[in-house]
């Protein structure tokens, strides 16, 4: 029997390693003078050079990165929400299920992200706050578009974006377009559920409001899920989404209170008091009420 001498692949590995030193590392391409690299594909030069602290305080970088990454996640949320709305509008629900699940998981990610910002203490935030001016997350056009697509509409919220016509156009379109939930209600009407006509065609700039005929339609779905499985699953995807959205809002409130207490927000709002009022917003009222009425 021949003597065992280490790994049977050691010779090949050694040879490959020698070759790798000359041509790459473990077969990896090392020269990108003529090819697209990882950083090129992701536009990292632009992304990583977009942080410009205005104060000398060390902690401002955290504040900037926290909000910039949130905006990137919101960009993906909007990408998915718009596509989900189009799928529902086209009576094609399975693709919407995947998209809505992804949005919920993004919101879960953003809930956890508040834990990073919460490492900023009140004195640390106070040192950089004067440099923020009147800038505030309240002015995020992407967040406002998300709220409008989910049905929480308010025409007064267009004004903070009037100075940027390209942003105003996006938010205004979301205000005037049926929300994701509106399209679900219209789908139920197309499928024969007795939904009031003024829920199918209405002033889309108005926020979602509870309607008894819509709850009755959802109750029919929930009382016989097997007969209406797609709509039943859609309803649960909506509840998952709003559940995650509520947690995101709640962690926003608690993080702000932890860092600034009840001071007014930089954008002029009442800060924590304003954010607490937003916790009372219900996006899909019939889907929550039916849980009591079942």
From Swiss-Prot:
EC code: 1.13.11.11
InterPro entries, sorted: Trp/Indoleamine_2_3_dOase-like (IPR037217), Trp_2-3-dOase_bac (IPR017485), Trp_2_3_dOase (IPR004981)
Reactions that this protein is recorded to catalyse: L-tryptophan + O2 = N-formyl-L-kynurenine
Subunit (UniProt): Homotetramer.
Binding residues for substrate: 63-67, 125, 129, 266
Ranges for region Disordered: 1-20
Keywords from the named record: Dioxygenase, Heme, Iron, Metal-binding, Oxidoreductase, Tryptophan catabolism
Pathway(s) of this molecule: Amino-acid degradation; L-tryptophan degradation via kynurenine pathway; L-kynurenine from L-tryptophan: step 1/2
Organism listed in the record: Cupriavidus necator (strain ATCC 17699 / DSM 428 / KCTC 22496 / NCIMB 10442 / H16 / Stanier 337)
Name of this protein: Tryptophan 2,3-dioxygenase
GO terms, biological process: L-tryptophan catabolic process to acetyl-CoA; L-tryptophan catabolic process to kynurenine
Chain's role: Heme-dependent dioxygenase that catalyzes the oxidative cleavage of the L-tryptophan (L-Trp) pyrrole ring and converts L-tryptophan to N-formyl-L-kynurenine. Catalyzes the oxidative cleavage of the indole moiety.
EC category name: oxidoreductase
Free-text cofactor note: Binds 1 heme group per subunit.
Family under the similarity heading: Belongs to the tryptophan 2,3-dioxygenase family.
Pfam families per record: Trp_dioxygenase (PF03301)
UniProt keyword DNA damage present: no
Essential cofactor(s): heme
Entry annotated with the keyword Iron: yes
GO molecular-function term, one example from the UniProt record: metal ion binding
Residues that bind heme: 252
SUPFAM superfamilies: Indolic compounds 2,3-dioxygenase-like
């Amino acid at each position: 029997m021949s003597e065992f001498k280490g790994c049977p692949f050691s010779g090949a590995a050694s040879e490959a390693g020698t070759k790798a030193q000359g041509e790459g590392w473990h077969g990896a391409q090392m020269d990108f003078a003529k090819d697209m690299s990882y950083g090129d594909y992701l536009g990292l030069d632009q992304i990583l050079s977009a942080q410009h602290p205005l104060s000398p305080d060390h902690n401002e970088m955290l504040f900037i990165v926290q909000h910039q990454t949130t905006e990137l996640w919101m960009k993906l949320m909007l990408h998915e929400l718009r596509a989900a709305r189009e799928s529902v509008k086209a009576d094609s629900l399975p693709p919407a299920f995947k998209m809505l699940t992804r949005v919920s998981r993004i919101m879960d990610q953003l809930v956890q992200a508040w834990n990073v910002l919460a490492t900023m203490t009140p004195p640390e935030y106070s040192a950089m706050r004067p440099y923020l001016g009147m800038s505030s997350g309240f002015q995020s056009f992407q967040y406002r578009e998300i709220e409008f697509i989910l049905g929480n509409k308010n025409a007064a919220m267009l004004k903070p974006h009037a100075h940027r016509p390209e942003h105003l156009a996006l938010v205004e379109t979301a205000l005037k377009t049926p929300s994701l939930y509106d399209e679900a209600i219209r789908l139920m009407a197309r499928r024969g559920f007795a939904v009031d006509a003024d829920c199918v065609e209405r002033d889309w700039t108005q926020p979602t409001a509870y309607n008894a005929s819509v709850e009755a339609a959802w109750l029919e779905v929930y009382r016989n899920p097997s007969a209406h499985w797609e709509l039943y699953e859609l309803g649960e995807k909506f509840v998952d989404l709003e559940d995650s959205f509520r947690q995101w809002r709640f962690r926003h409130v608690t993080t702000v209170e932890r860092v600034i207490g009840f001071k007014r927000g930089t954008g002029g709002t009442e800060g924590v008091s304003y954010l607490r009022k937003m916790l009372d917003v219900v996006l899909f009222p019939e889907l929550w009420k039916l849980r009591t009425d079942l």
